[in-house]
UniProtKB/Swiss-Prot annotation:
This is Ankyrin repeat protein B18. ANK repeats lie at residues 56-87, 135-164, 167-213, 217-249, 253-285, 327-356. Residues 541-574 form the F-box domain. The keyword Repeat applies. InterPro entries: Ank_repeat_dom-contain_49, Ankyrin_rpt, Ankyrin_rpt-contain_sf, F-box_dom, PRANC_domain. The lineage of its organism: Viruses, Varidnaviria, Bamfordvirae, Nucleocytoviricota, Pokkesviricetes.
């Protein structure tokens, strides 16, 4: 839709009549001016363009540079009719400053014209922040505006110091922030090509820019780039690494660039691998404290491929294992505390001890409950690790805290209750004893009504009675579901499959299915590994031939499904 022109001037007046200042202010500040218009021609010939307003000190040039309908063509007309580009208004900002920080779609040619009209060299203190403010404006205000490579080159060639600091930042700090935010969801920024970004950074370096300059928080530009959540592009990051930023500089929080990335709340596996590889190739072996911190901080963070990343880190840093502690906690403690189920699963596969206590005697379950920031995932994470908990005292302690657990999904909570009743024989009896207590009832008021809670427990308990009455060979279905030994459960596999389809079990069907699948896959992979290693077991030169096959099966059952899978299908090395 075309804009309607606003006419505020009477161009038919006699040339001897004075144009009022408020007319000029309105005209240049708010009107959509056509550079070929009779109006503009009338104004530039009949008005002193360098007359300053009493309060603001603005001239016609200042007013037009703040006009939302700014065009390069009108600015050229003003420059050709002798506007003074050196006049400072009360704000203290020179016209070239306003042009570079306020105007959109500015032409490199008008920038050169304005600079050439000013005889002062750009190295003068009045212009020292010009390049920094130009790039800063594209980062903070004019987000859809491009950073013109030619303008950057001209400003640097004219003597602007690329290392000038304002509020601790250099122009490169702001440029790296622009590069990071281009990829941030919802920013709607103009894309910056990698080739262009590389040329601009090269221009800075050619003019003596310090690539590792520190801001007030001790961050280099590369620190800032890596710390922006959800915005790092692998190809852009790879390009920035070609300038060999210093990986050993710690900011005021003790974080190197890699640690800034690890703590950014969003990690791409490929970028993590690239950063570590670059460090080890160009710097050398990473200090043990930094390695430890990388692994522990990674577990707290969202990542695109958590299993791949934790496997890579554990294999890369050989002196960090499941027993390593940082601030009194093992890797598994941190994984539980931050509800990182992918990492929990991996660490338990490689024999991490879920029942180990922290240095201040806290169990993993307590760490999950205490982390209020992740309260919406508390129940799901507790459900996830309950399959690994066998200590009855730990389960009883968890049951005692049930009234205080945050409930966001009633189905997950119901499943959680069913696990607790299955694993703790005393749960239902203790609940019945306290049922009439007002204090006990009141503790449930925050997340769920007591009646709802009581009905869930009653339903679960009634179904456990049915489990106890259901015979499975020489035992009951109740005992089978409480058993964690997949070797023992193998003999009940076919019965579990039958009960798995039994519609009479509405609450415990999920647990039956989990038990069945766990035993099924364990048995399947044990058989695969046994068949694969059979030539070894039967080789007369091998001492394993002395062992009965039953013992070999027992040994294989000690391995996790993950281990058995990797033996059956070894990962291919690229």
């Amino acid at each position: 839709m075309s804009r309607r022109l606003i006419y505020v001037l009477n161009i038919n007046r006699k040339s001897t009549h004075k144009i009022q200042e408020n007319e000029i202010y309105t005209y240049f500040s708010y009107c959509n001016i056509d550079h070929t218009s009779t109006e503009l021609d009338f104004v530039v010939k009949n008005y002193d363009l360098n007359r300053r307003q009493p309060v603001t000190g603005y001239t016609a040039l200042h007013c037009y540079l703040y006009n939302n309908y700014f065009t390069n063509d009108v600015l050229k007309v003003l420059l050709n009719h002798g506007v003074d580009v050196t006049i400072k208004p009360s704000s203290g900002h020179m016209p070239i400053y306003i042009l570079l920080t306020r105007c959109c779609n500015i032409s490199h040619n008008v920038v050169i014209d304005m600079i050439n009209k000013d005889k002062t060299h750009l190295s003068h203190k009045d212009y020292s922040n010009l390049l920094l403010e130009y790039i800063k404006s594209r980062y903070m205000l004019l987000k859809e505006e491009d950073i013109d490579e030619n303008i950057v080159s001209t400003l640097l060639d004219k003597g602007i110091d690329p290392n000038f600091k304002q509020d601790g930042y250099t122009a490169l700090h702001y440029y790296y922030l622009c590069l990071a935010h281009v990829y941030k969801p919802g920013e709607c920024r103009k894309p910056i090509t990698i080739k262009k970004a590389k040329r601009i950074i090269s221009l800075f370096i050619q003019h003596g820019a310090n690539l590792n300059a520190l801001d007030n928080c001790g961050n280099t530009p590369f620190h800032l780039y890596l710390s922006i959540e959800m915005c790092n592009n692998i190809h852009m990051t790879k390009m920035l690494l070609t300038f060999n930023p210093n990986f050993e500089i710690c900011n005021n929080h003790g974080l190197t660039p890699i640690l800034c990335y690890i703590t950014s709340d969003y990690i791409q596996h490929d970028i993590l691998v690239m950063l570590i590889h670059h460090y080890e190739t160009n710097v050398g072996e990473m200090p043990i404290d930094e390695r430890r911190m990388i692994v522990f901080e990674f577990i707290k963070t969202y990542s695109t491929r958590p299993l791949d990343s934790i496997t890579y880190l554990m294999n890369r840093f050989k002196n960090i294992d499941i027993h390593t502690r940082y601030e009194g906690k093992t890797l598994l403690h941190i994984a539980c505390e931050y509800n990182n189920t992918h990492v929990i699963d991996y660490l338990i596969r490689i024999n991490g001890d879920i029942n180990a206590l922290t240095d201040n005697n806290k169990h993993a379950i307590q760490l999950i409950i205490d982390n209020k920031e992740n309260s919406q995932y508390t129940i799901d994470c507790l459900l996830y690790i309950l399959r690994y908990i066998v200590d009855k005292n730990v389960i009883r302690s968890l049951v005692d805290q049930l009234p205080y657990l945050p409930i966001f999904d009633i189905k997950s909570f119901e499943k959680f209750i069913s696990y607790c009743i299955l694993l703790d024989d005393t749960f239902y009896d203790r609940h019945v004893q306290n049922r009439d207590s007002k204090t006990y009832r009141y503790t449930f008021s925050k997340y769920i009504s007591f009646d709802k809670y009581d009905s869930i427990i009653t339903k679960c308990y009634e179904e456990t009675i049915l489990l106890k009455l259901s015979t499975v060979l020489d035992t009951t279905l109740y005992s089978v579901l409480r058993c964690h030994n997949s070797r023992k459960l193998k003999r009940y596999l076919s019965v579990l499959k039958k009960y798995n389809n039994d519609k009479s079990f509405k609450i415990y069907s999920n647990i039956m299915n989990e038990r069945y699948l766990n035993v099924y896959y364990k048995d399947m992979y044990v058989s695969k590994v046994y068949d694969k290693l059979f030539p070894v077991f039967t080789d007369k030169k091998c001492l394993l031939t002395l062992l009965p096959s039953e013992i070999i099966y027992e040994i294989l059952y000690m391995l996790t499904i993950y281990d058995l899978y990797n033996i059956s299908y070894p990962p291919t090395k690229v």
